[in-house]
Amino acid sequence: MAPQNPLLGTWRVESFERWTADGTLTQPLGMPPAGYAVFDDTGHAFVQLGRATTTDLSPKDIAQSLMAYFGPYAIDGDELTVTVEASNMAAYIGSHQVRRFARDGDALTLGVEGQYRAKLRRVTA
């Protein structure tokens, strides 16, 4: 029997934090941010994060905050790798995006230490 997939389902982003070069922690997508990460049972990931439309930003600014990518994913211990098929971020296309993750019930934290951290909550399994 294969081990249960700890990421399977739809996860809503609750916070997105990024560290600046000098080590300052920022919230570039505002609070609360908007978006979801979906990990399906066929082994595909779909990630879309951005600023919430309730902010005082223009529609153009909100659209420019969007980070989206998708592709097949693999899990190895506490490490997630998404092989990016397409993205609105040119540098991601064809890359392997590797993230450490920790899950506590319906709460998920993933990111790259010293770069960024996203906290999400399970919507569906």
What do these predicted regions represent?
Residues 1-125:
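Lipid interaction determinants
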